[in-house]
Amino acid sequence: MKIKSLLSVLLSLAMVISLFSLAGCGSDKPEKLKPTNDGDTTTTLSGIDEYKGTTVTFATWVDHSKSEAAATWASFTEKYDITIKTVNIGQWNYVNKLSGLVAAGQSPDIIVENGNFPALFPVAQRLDEIKTFDLKDDFWDQNVINYGSINGVPYFINAVNTPWTFRGCILYNKKVFEDNGIKSPMEFYEEDNWTIDTFVECATRVSKLGSDYVGAFVPLENACNIFGVKLVEYKDSKFINNVGNDQVAAACRWLMNGVDSKIFNPIIGNEDFAKFTSGKTGMVAYSDYGLRISGPFRAMDSKDMGYLPMPKVSASDEHYPVSNSLRAYGICKGARNAEAAAYFLRYFLDYENYNKNDVFISEEASDFAFSMNEMNHNPLLGTSNGVLCILDGLSDSAAKYYKTITDSSAAQVATNLKSFSNNIEACVKEANDIIDRVGGNQ
């Protein structure tokens, strides 16, 4: 996903993954697993035969028998005779339900970090002790590994060129702009003039089409991403309340000026997704999840979907801002088939094992999503939302904190940021307590 709405946590990042197989008799050092192309565009994993006939359990809310990964799961089982079984756990109460399974001795093998960071650390195994992972392989995204580590010990991973991370971007309804003779975001981008000011210009012109039009949906966290800043930082295995950062204040003022002017809406829910699809909204600050066949805009004609990077704060900025959801995968404590699960993750997270037409609305949209990997000079990873949800374990509970800002006005931003900072102190403390507890037991 992050890039994520205030009412949901979708949200990462790109990462690469490789595995070790068992070494020869008498050696405790595994041999690096080398994927080879077998001629049908998928990956062959040497050394996997030892796990034939076994089952890997995957805790997720997605029915992958019907998702964009359906063919990938089926081909893995067909090639390697390893069954993948879903353990269904709802997205919004994932942490609490998973913790209950672990406590009851019913641990799945694979777990998903999807906006709950760092609440899943206590139920995750350290990956450096699983012999079929080679975490130094450049298939893995080292940025994700660093975030998914405590005191240098890795717990979570993802791949660089994976379909299972979500990159921040701006989506716009081409038809709204073309039918009304409004200069489009892409035209500004092609002029190298795609900034927060021209974003506002686009939103203003759309909003003037009528009282039922919204210029742009801009969630608070995505406004911060545009300004290159996070509400909660994670550095050196420690969370830091970053609400006092000047750029956070600048992002909030920019957002709330747009709200006050009735050109921005800071909330995105299902009705708002429909408003964009139906042509009553110009732009959405979202992620490339919106370009997926399974995404919230799937009812929209793909020819009407426009997409481009988030705008620069200043035209002179060297780079367009880049953010990724902190989507990552781990092996659960108590997993019964961790080594085979590692092989499956290597296969599942490799975009080469997918048909692009099963994932994105078009090949062009797929190319755009992955082109943002090339822009990842210093991508922001979405860690803030998980910290704000940590006290109750519900993935959508951060919205109540965001309302401290979004339910007010631009004139009140400075005062409201102080309240916001005070309100989340308990969340930051609990997040750091989790890190300390897990780190102390390594």
Model segments located where?
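Hinge/lid segment of periplasmic solute-binding proteins
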Residues: G39-K52, N114-R167, D197, L308
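Short, polar/charged alpha-helical segment
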Residues: D63-D81, K175-F177
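Extracytoplasmic "Venus flytrap"/periplasmic binding protein-like
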Residues: A74-V144, S149, N180, G282-M283, ...
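Conserved C-terminal helix/tail region of periplasmic/extracytoplasmic solute-binding proteins
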Residues: T83, A338, E352-Q442
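Short, solvent-exposed loop/beta-turn-alpha elements that line the ligand-binding surface or hinge
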Residues: K131-W140, F188-E191, L231-A250, A299, ...
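Extracytoplasmic/periplasmic substrate-recognition and gating elements
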Residues: G152, R298-E363
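Extracytoplasmic/periplasmic solute-binding protein
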Residues: V153-G168, E178, D192-I240
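Glycine-centered hinge/linker elements that transmit conformational signals in sensory
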Residues: E201-A203, S237-G269
